[in-house]
Regions:
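A positional "C-terminalness" feature that preferentially activates on distal terminal regions of long
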Residues: 1-202
């Protein structure tokens, strides 16, 4: 067992095109500092969850995996195992250090931007749109996107958008000049790739 100290200065990164970045944010591309202490067993990060795999747990584990891959670029083979009530753990395999840095820097930068401007892509909705994790659907007339957005929508979202998924689509078009699906793909496609690598490594 080891504890990895993460102390990273992140610049640039893979970010979606958002029309308000240059006009509404002050110094949006300044370097960002990420610090953490992450426990690993060899080259594996283990995350335990008593419930089924959730999009938030998957995303948090992915961020930790990227962070250690960047913090220790000379070590290869980093992976994460999410152990849930399912029979098999969910395995994610990290990309190479440079690609991991690019993805991580983009995620951290968008998280920082979203503290100043609305970024309308919560985890459950993104996972539903990309079919990474499908939400519970009460009946066949409710789409996966609507079911995911219903789970995400709360009092924090209410001032900006209703619980109707079509309103989220409208907000994305008006505020971000893009679609929810495009934002979801930006967030989730690298995770899908890491899951595919994990299944091949079993």
């Amino acid at each position: 067992r080891q504890v990895i100290d993460v102390n990273l200065e992140l610049t640039d990164g893979d970010v979606p095109h958002l029309p308000w970045v240059d006009s509404h944010l002050t110094d949006p591309y300044r370097p960002l500092l990420l610090t953490d202490r992450i426990e690993a067993h060899g080259v594996t990060i283990v995350r335990m969850s008593p419930a089924n795999l959730s999009p938030r747990t998957l995303l948090e584990t992915w961020l930790r995996l990227l962070a250690v891959a960047v913090a220790q670029p000379d070590v290869t083979g980093w992976r994460a195992a999410v152990v849930t009530r399912s029979a098999n753990p969910e395995i994610l395999v990290a990309p190479d250090a440079q690609q991991a840095r690019n993805i991580l820097a983009g995620l951290v930068r968008v998280a920082w931007w979203s503290s100043q401007q609305l970024f309308p892509m919560p985890a459950r909705t993104a996972a539903a749109l990309t079919e990474v994790i499908l939400p519970y659907r009460p009946n066949r007339w409710v789409t996966a996107a609507q079911a995911g957005w219903t789970e995400d929508h709360d009092s924090n979202w209410s001032p900006f958008v209703s619980a109707d998924y079509s309103d989220l689509e409208r907000l994305c078009r008006q505020h971000c000049d893009t679609s929810p699906l495009d934002l979801a793909r930006w967030l989730m496609t690298p995770i899908t790739t890491a899951r595919t690598r994990g299944r091949r490594s079993r």
